[in-house]
């Protein structure tokens, strides 16, 4: 399918994504997004303003349409041109442009389970609980104990008797049942 398939179709009824697919199919090679947009604009005879308004949707359609594949750096191709396994190899990864040899030399494997403690690379799994850390220095602990009157922090409530008598609490509103009341209920049944 190419642009020749659209010769009998009204160009106003064609979508930009259909025309882009036909253009890439006719060309048979990768194209920059800007070039695709220019070709679509020429074929559909659309004004710059119309293209500018439809451009975000067109770009979204190219990303979501399974027939297109981004090759990186805003270059597009048709997915059918590549074997399934080769798609990832063909895509340009700009973040991978660095020298692979130099990155491999910098990475050093570390075994965290070594029995020796020669280097700083060994992880101490016995000292990994933040709750075990002592937040105060031992030298200040003696001074703090002398100044600390932990008994002063708590009241010795000598008037505990006042707690038993709640004024108009819910306890006053509830009726209390005695064993005699339970026996009376059983007799009535």
UniProtKB/Swiss-Prot annotation:
From its record, what is one biological process in GO terms? regulation of DNA-templated transcription
> Any keyword Transferase?
yes
| Positions of the UniProt region annotated as Disordered | 90-189
| Pfam families named among the record's database cross-references | HARE-HTH
Tell me where in this chain the HTH HARE-type domain is found: 14-81
Write the record's keywords in alphabetical order, separated by commas.
DNA-directed RNA polymerase, Nucleotidyltransferase, Transcription, Transferase
Cellular component terms (Gene Ontology) = DNA-directed RNA polymerase complex
Question: How is this protein named in the record?
Answer: Probable DNA-directed RNA polymerase subunit delta
Q: Which organism is it from?
A: Lactobacillus delbrueckii subsp. bulgaricus (strain ATCC 11842 / DSM 20081 / BCRC 10696 / JCM 1002 / NBRC 13953 / NCIMB 11778 / NCTC 12712 / WDCM 00102 / Lb 14)
Q: What is the name of the gene encoding this protein?
A: rpoE
């Amino acid at each position: 399918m190419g642009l020749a398939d659209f010769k009998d179709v009204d160009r106003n009824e064609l979508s930009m994504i259909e025309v882009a697919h036909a253009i890439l199919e006719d060309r048979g090679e990768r194209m920059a997004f800007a070039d695709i947009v220019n070709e679509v604009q020429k074929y559909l005879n659309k004004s710059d303003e119309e293209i500018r308004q439809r451009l975000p949707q067109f770009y979204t359609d190219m990303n979501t349409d399974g027939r297109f594949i981004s090759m990186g750096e805003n270059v597009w191709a048709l997915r059918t041109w590549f074997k399934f396994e080769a798609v990832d190899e063909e895509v340009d990864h700009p973040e991978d442009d660095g020298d692979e040899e130099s990155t491999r030399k910098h990475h050093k494997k570390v075994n965290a389970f070594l029995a020796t403690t020669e280097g700083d690379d060994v992880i101490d799994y016995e000292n990994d609980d933040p709750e075990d850390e002592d937040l105060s220095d031992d030298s200040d602990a003696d001074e703090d104990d002398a100044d600390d009157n932990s008994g002063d922090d708590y009241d010795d409530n000598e008037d505990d008797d006042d707690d038993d008598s709640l004024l108009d609490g819910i306890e006053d509103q509830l009726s209390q049942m005695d064993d005699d009341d339970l026996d009376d209920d059983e007799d009535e049944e």
